[in-house]
Swiss-Prot record:
One of its GO terms (cellular component) is plasma membrane. The modification N-acetylalanine is found at A2. It is a multi-pass membrane protein. This is CASP-like protein 4D1. It is found in: Cell membrane. Keywords: Acetylation, Cell membrane, Membrane, Transmembrane, Transmembrane helix. Homodimer and heterodimers. The chain crosses the membrane at residues 15-35, 61-81, 98-118, 150-170. Residues 2-14, 82-97, 171-178 are cytoplasmic.
Length: 178
């Protein structure tokens, strides 16, 4: 006789998972808005040079990671709400959660690292070339880069916690009887 299937996650655990999914999506949405609106106009020798975020490759990568993560987070949010409402979980959901959480969390981590790295390097280079203070618009440009990278890092941490839960859920999933 086959062992009884494990009990579905408790309502409290489902609520925590739902809140983590919402938190991840919120962090990613704010990241996308911040980085996509990041632009600065440099005044060098009476010449104006507009520097939008997409002129910096690492910021483009960061935006791409955030958008991909946001799409995944929204899909997962709908799946989690569906599971929460019905109390039923499709057998393939365990694997989708497991692999998706792992891949997307690493994508978010690398996007965050790229954002931190390029913000520091470009700011240090700019400081070496031109003296500026905290009221300079260039400082605001780099501050938005740091803020976006920080939010992407928070989204990674949130998704990494979800990844632990999806690993546990996969190992305890009900095995279909043939």
């Amino acid at each position: 006789m086959a062992p009884p299937p494990p009990a579905p996650p408790s309502v409290t655990l489902r609520t925590v998972l739902l809140l983590l999914r919402v938190l991840t999506a919120a962090f990613l949405l704010i990241t996308v808005v911040l980085i996509s609106t990041n632009t600065v106009t440099l005044e060098i020798s009476s010449t104006s040079i507009k520097l939008p975020f997409n002129d910096v490759y690492a910021y483009r990568y960061m935006l791409s990671a955030a958008v991909i993560g946001l799409v995944y987070a929204v899909v997962q949010l709908f799946l989690t709400i569906s599971q929460f409402a019905t109390g039923k979980t499709h057998p393939l959901t365990y694997q989708f959660d497991f692999y998706g959480d792992k891949v997307i969390s690493y994508l978010l981590a690398t996007g965050s690292a790229a954002g931190f790295g390029v913000s520091k390097d470009l700011k240090d280079t700019y400081i070496a070339l031109i003296e500026f203070d905290s009221t300079d618009p260039v400082d605001k440009f780099f501050s938005k880069g740091y803020a976006s990278a920080s939010l992407l890092l928070f989204a990674f941490v949130s998704l990494a916690v979800l990844s632990v839960f999806s690993s546990l859920a996969l190992s305890k999933r009900p095995v279909p009887v043939s």
